[in-house]
Amino acid sequence: MYALLEAIEARARANRARVAMGIRDPNHKTLESAWKAQELGYAQVVLVGSKKEIDKIGTGLEVIDTEDPEKVLSDLLVSRKVDAVIRGTAKASGTLSSLKKALGMKRICRLALLLTADGTPFFLAPVGIDEGNTISDKLRMITLGAEHIRRLGVEPAVGVLSGGRMGDIGRDRRVDRTLADGEFITGRALELGINTKHYTILIEDAVKESNFIIAPDGISGNLIFRTVAFLGGGDGLGAPVLMDDYVFVDTSRVGGHFTKAIMLASALSHLNKERKKVIH
């Protein structure tokens, strides 16, 4: 897995995709991280937001002037005027609803890529607060996520989490339900040929032994993401939406660092181009 980041960086530099980034309430830190991605050769970065506000801070990057970056990001992606999009600091609800509308999708699945404080990378799902609330949702995330992870040259090892240890059965009905769900999901994923283990509540063991963590639901997944990236000294590279024809990497507005998310988007765009060559 440690070689994963090197592979992503190499693909980004080989591709140097045109990547659009949503901007609201711009600040120096945000714009500097976008400029750094272009300077390092990861992508040609296009900022999408209020030019007036962006120019107050200053940037050497291309700017598409709009007061509605949430909608324009999806328009740029669907029209293929850019190779990939990252949400940047655009609003989450508006951006994702515009994306679903533009692509005719009822639901989306996101797969976050995180680094622990010691630099260990792992994938995480679900990460949206309204995602992964049913067994079928989580199984869909496992199958889609495993497929996308393999495209990066990594064999997925799935670690399923639940709300307690097996010895806790009987203490709480909700905990019992998550444990039963964890056992069922693990068994079904194994039947589908995906290397999967139920780690109960022991996330520390799951991260050591697995590279794709499945949280009990989207709320706990979002909390794991925020704890690792914003409190635990780790980092979040972004959360790509799992789809074949387009590249959209969701990001959090909190951190302010978008260099690696742009790198990831450019690399995924490169993988998409390679896959389409093979198909055709």
Curated annotation (Swiss-Prot):
UniProt keyword list: Methyltransferase, Transferase
Biological process terms in GO annotation: methylation
Any one GO molecular function term: methyltransferase activity
InterPro entries: MeTrfase_MtxX_xsu
Enzyme class: transferase
Domain of life (superkingdom): Archaea
Assigned EC number: 2.1.1.-
Entry's family note: Belongs to the MtxX family.
Summary of subunit composition and partner proteins: May be part of a complex composed of 3 subunits; MtxA, MtxH and MtxX.
Name of the molecule in the record: Putative methyltransferase mtx subunit X
